[in-house]
Amino acid sequence: MSSGKITQIIGPVVDVEFGSDAKLPEINNALIVYKDVNGLKTKITLEVALELGDGAVRTIAMESTDGLTRGLEVLDTGKAVSVPVGEATLGRVFNVLGDVIDGGEEFAADAERNPIHKKAPTFDELSTANEVLVTGIKVVDLLAPYLKGGKVGLFGGAGVGKTVLIQELIHNIAQEHGGISVFTGVGERTREGNDLYWEMKESGVIEKTAMVFGQMNEPPGARMRVALTGLTIAEYFRDVQGQDVLLFIDNIFRFTQAGSEVSALLGRMPSAVGYQPTLATEMGQLQERITSTKKGSVTSIQAIYVPADDYTDPAPATAFAHLDATTNLERRLTQMGIYPAVDPLASSSRALTPEIVGEEHYEVAMEVQRVLQRYKELQDIIAILGMDELSDDEKILVGRARRIQFFLSQNFHVAEQFTGQPGSYVPIDKTVHDFKEILEGKYDEVPEDAFRGVGPIEDVLEKAKSMGY
């Protein structure tokens, strides 16, 4: 192990000098420095980001640099940060370095570990099969279905329900498919991570899930790399065990934000809106590793915070380019009490074609969108002149559109404790069948309110009966 000395510390960025004759560590190598706090030796990991010349490197700290001083000895490990992988990670919670943070026992020293930096699968390793991943959430399965091995973006501003939707997806995949999930918390609230952990523990889902956190209070180095840690764990299940894995990243915007913080400290010129000039490259390196291979698949569902609800911001716009499906959450729908607040017209998926979902599903989805689009166009007339100015056909269409809009809402298992209503999982065939009947006018006489927050159409009829219909 070659060793050097700290020459400069600027927040999370640490310069280390190895001397002009010494062997310099490679880019992305992990360096270790020990600091003494009240007589206790604490290990801090640094990652090499730049080679400055004259035997010096610039590194990013994965932990707080409080207590570090100039002149401290730094050791080169000779390899990248590596994290535990395999069955032992299930039910556990880690940080970016693969250290256990759930209070349980540490991993054995000889536990299998993989480096967090690796190349994306080659072209001939990729799988081209298109298969829909059934989520049991009506609005998603009908209008913007997810593909196995695809990338899904959950777009929405603050507080519209991205994290709750992710929790429900983890629940449904574990309960209905028995699949493995890896949850990666990137720069989000520690409280939410804690709540998610206990909720998953209570529901028994945790046994099929590995959790990795680099939350808001962590230095930017940890927030920038924690997504790679989660991805490395997911890749092992795909490549070695041949599994179909779900990778949840909450929130991909914080990944970009952390990169932006680090970029300025590394001395790079900022790009558009102050973001790092390497934004597209960093996003590409992460996203290209998330894919289906001939061995298995990693399907990723990424919550994407949209700053000030501006979709042209470079961070969400860069993420858009990599996605197969988008689920757009709309604040207007939360104000109407429709949960999940998924915008049925703005959400999209490349899986919504007759070749992938089938002719009937495609036609029902197109008709649902047509009815909702027409209703949207008529809303101005209704607001100014009232319903009486509409033709009889338009009145029928508005009634159906409102029933469809409410029927796209659904009670979630993970929200039972707040709503007092049991959650519902609706198979995709049932979803298509029920919406087809609504479009045919079979339920035109059923009160609109009966369609709110229910599962299949039978729940609507039961609710209507209890309302005295």
Swiss-Prot record:
Catalyzed chemical reaction(s): ATP + H2O + 4 H(+)(in) = ADP + phosphate + 5 H(+)(out)
The protein's Enzyme Commission number: 7.1.2.2
Keywords: ATP synthesis, ATP-binding, Cell membrane, CF(1), Hydrogen ion transport, Ion transport, Membrane, Nucleotide-binding, Translocase, Transport
SUPFAM superfamilies in the cross-refs: C-terminal domain of alpha and beta subunits of F1 ATP synthase, N-terminal domain of alpha and beta subunits of F1 ATP synthase, P-loop containing nucleoside triphosphate hydrolases
Gene Ontology cellular component annotations, sorted alphabetically: plasma membrane; proton-transporting ATP synthase complex
The keyword Phosphoprotein is assigned to this record: no
Membrane topology: Peripheral membrane protein
Root EC class: translocase
Localization, UniProt: Cell membrane
Positions that bind ATP: 156-163
Keyword NAD among UniProt keywords: no
Record field: transmembrane: none
CDD domains: ATP-synt_F1_beta_C, ATP-synt_F1_beta_N, F1-ATPase_beta_CD
Sequence similarity: Belongs to the ATPase alpha/beta chains family.
Subunit note: F-type ATPases have 2 components, CF(1) - the catalytic core - and CF(0) - the membrane proton channel. CF(1) has five subunits: alpha(3), beta(3), gamma(1), delta(1), epsilon(1). CF(0) has three main subunits: a(1), b(2) and c(9-12). The alpha and beta chains form an alternating ring which encloses part of the gamma chain. CF(1) is attached to CF(0) by a central stalk formed by the gamma and epsilon chains, while a peripheral stalk is formed by the delta and b chains.
Matching PANTHER family: ATP SYNTHASE, ATP SYNTHASE SUBUNIT BETA, MITOCHONDRIAL
Protein name: ATP synthase subunit beta
Lineage of source species: Bacteria, Bacillati, Bacillota, Bacilli, Lactobacillales
Gene responsible for this protein: atpD
